[in-house]
Swiss-Prot record:
EC annotation from Swiss-Prot or TrEMBL: 3.4.24.-
Family: Belongs to the peptidase M76 family.
Superkingdom classification of source: Eukaryota
Purpose of the protein: Has a dual role in the assembly of mitochondrial ATPase. Acts as a protease that removes N-terminal residues of mitochondrial ATPase CF(0) subunit 6 at the intermembrane space side. Also involved in the correct assembly of the membrane-embedded ATPase CF(0) particle, probably mediating association of subunit 6 with the subunit 9 ring.
Topology class, membrane: Peripheral membrane protein
GO function term, MF aspect, one: metalloendopeptidase activity
One GO CC term, this protein: mitochondrial inner membrane
The name this protein goes by in its record: Mitochondrial inner membrane protease atp23
GO terms for biological process, alphabetical: mitochondrial protein processing; mitochondrial proton-transporting ATP synthase complex assembly
Positions annotated as active site in the UniProt record: 137
Annotated binding of a divalent metal cation, by residue: 136, 140
Length: 237
């Protein structure tokens, strides 16, 4: 096989063909999309396609994220409330420490006590998704200031703040689960979503042994942490 033929099939000599075709032109992008739709692209190829797309759209994604972030900081009721609650505890989250960046791992965002909030601009589906993500990370910031969370060494602390963030941010409300994630249950949907996302987050931490360990830790703190809606009077969304 010639070099050009190998390149057109998204593979190199000695490497398995993933179905991904490198290239930024419109025709190549459409060929990749049709390859995905036809089931001819492997999971590795799909990831290659996503990475190339994210790099190509990085400037536009970050600009859109920053514009929506600034709008939400000014007009979103939940974001403004969380900002005020954090400020009352001596913290300050604003456009200068809520960063929109392209992320290489598949997550929506993150919180670091020393730096602020990271929003993965290439993972944001729309402004509603960004609002949920900002609210989630702001709950972490609030918990860090109010409860002195030990992020590195205490899995129970991590589980508790993940339960609260998923419950209070709005990311587990019924409409979000139904239309975006394909979760069709009507009863106990909110609790199941919160539990599922908390277990996944705890499982990803270095101190967690396996999924059973993550589930055990979440169960140990579930009742008290799920009932704790501070700084809200009740679950807002």
């Amino acid at each position: 096989m010639s070099t050009s033929e190998s390149s057109n099939n998204g593979s190199q000599p000695g490497n398995q063909d993933t179905g991904y075709i490198p290239g930024d032109d419109t025709w190549t992008q459409w060929r990749n999309i049709f390859s995905i739709l036809a089931g001819r692209m492997t999971d590795e190829g799909k990831e290659q396609f996503r990475v190339a797309r994210d790099i190509r759209n990085e400037v536009a994604d970050c600009k859109r994220c920053e514009d929506q972030r600034d709008y939400l900081l000014q007009f979103s009721p939940i974001i403004r409330f969380m900002s005020d609650s954090i400020r009352q505890l001596g913290g300050d989250l604003h456009s200068h420490n809520i960063y929109c960046r392209r992320c290489t791992n598949r997550k929506a965002g993150g919180f670091d006590p020393d730096y602020g909030i990271l929003i993965c601009a290439n993972e944001m589906k729309d402004q509603g998704h960004l609002e949920d993500t900002m609210a989630h990370e702001m709950v972490h910031a609030y918990d860090h200031l109010r409860f002195k969370v030990d992020w590195m060494n205490n899995l129970r602390h991590a589980a508790c703040t993940e339960i609260r963030a998923s419950s209070l941010s709005g990311e587990c409300r019924w409409a979000r689960e139904f239309f975006r994630r394909g979760q069709w249950k009507f009863t106990q949907q909110h609790q199941e979503c919160v539990r599922r996302r908390a277990i996944l987050s705890v499982r990803a931490r270095p101190g967690c042994k396996d999924e059973a360990h993550a589930e055990k830790v979440v169960n140990e703190v579930w009742d008290s942490c799920f009932r704790d809606t501070r700084p809200f009077d009740e679950i807002y969304r």
